[in-house]
């Protein structure tokens, strides 16, 4: 452990991370970044004796700052060609899924992309969710995808019937669970599973050195091995990635 801390101290002293409102993975509580991923980042930085700051921003601004190298890291990040081009990505930390939701009065249930023909599908984007949805619809015509600025607004619009009687939305199931419980959106129901997904932390290729990235990964490995990472995730009802 001493060697790990000594090596990491020489690699970096201050890191600036950005994230978004994506509860329970990350969210703001006043001026404090809270949620599972901020706890994991803070625990890793404490282990490494790094000074780390986490800022909660609208996703597009956070992503732009990270891609431009204005900040060191960003989360949550999926495995995709665009993300790998811009970021060094940690091993996946948490696994979840993208599910469909609709009004209880709608009998829609998703089994395959063809089921979405003739439907308007709402999704938060541009985001990892919208990327995965659009990839799944490449060979499926007659589907209108509507991008919405955040998941909270997405579910409120669905609840208000803004996507029509046959409208559906797709979003992260853990985010949906959190928002439905906290906003009492019990007129909504799960309408099927799109795909499983895992998230990690991205480090800007324009800002962070390979040595810094490797040191952070070693810190994450220590948290994984001593059970602290799983304990943090379980506190938020989340599943560690394999």
Residue ranges with predicted function:
Residues 44, 66-67, 116, 157-162, ...:
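Hydrophobic residues within well-ordered alpha-helices
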Residues 64-67, 76-86, 134, 165-195:
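A ligand-binding cleft/hinge motif common to bilobed small-molecule-binding domains
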Residues 15-27, 113-129:
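Short loop->beta-strand "edge-of-pocket" segments that line small-molecule binding or catalytic clefts
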Residues 12-81, 85, 147, 226, ...:
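Extracytoplasmic small-molecule ligand-binding "clamshell" domains
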């Amino acid at each position: 452990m001493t060697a790990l801390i000594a090596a990491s101290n020489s690699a970096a002293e201050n890191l600036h991370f950005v994230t978004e409102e994506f509860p329970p993975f990350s969210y703001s509580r006043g001026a404090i970044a809270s949620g599972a991923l901020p706890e994991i980042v803070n625990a890793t930085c404490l282990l490494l004796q790094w000074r780390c700051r986490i800022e909660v921003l609208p996703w597009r601004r956070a992503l732009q700052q990270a891609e431009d190298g204005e900040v060191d890291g960003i989360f949550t990040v999926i495995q995709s060609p665009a993300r790998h081009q811009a970021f060094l990505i940690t091993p996946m930390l948490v696994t979840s899924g993208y599910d469909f939701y609709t009004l209880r009065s709608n009998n829609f249930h998703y089994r395959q992309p063809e089921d979405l023909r003739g439907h308007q599908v709402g999704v938060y984007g541009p985001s990892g969710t919208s990327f995965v949805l659009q990839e799944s619809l490449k060979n499926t015509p007659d589907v209108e995808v509507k991008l919405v600025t955040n998941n909270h607004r997405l579910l409120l619009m669905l609840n208000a019937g803004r996507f029509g009687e046959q409208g559906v939305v797709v979003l992260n199931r853990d985010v949906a669970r959190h928002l439905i419980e906290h906003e009492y959106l019990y007129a909504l129901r799960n309408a099927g599973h799109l795909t499983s997904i895992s998230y990690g932390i991205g480090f800007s290729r324009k800002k962070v050195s390979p040595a810094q990235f490797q040191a952070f990964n070693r810190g994450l490995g220590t948290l994984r091995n001593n059970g602290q990472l799983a304990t943090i995730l379980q506190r938020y009802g989340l599943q560690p990635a394999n």
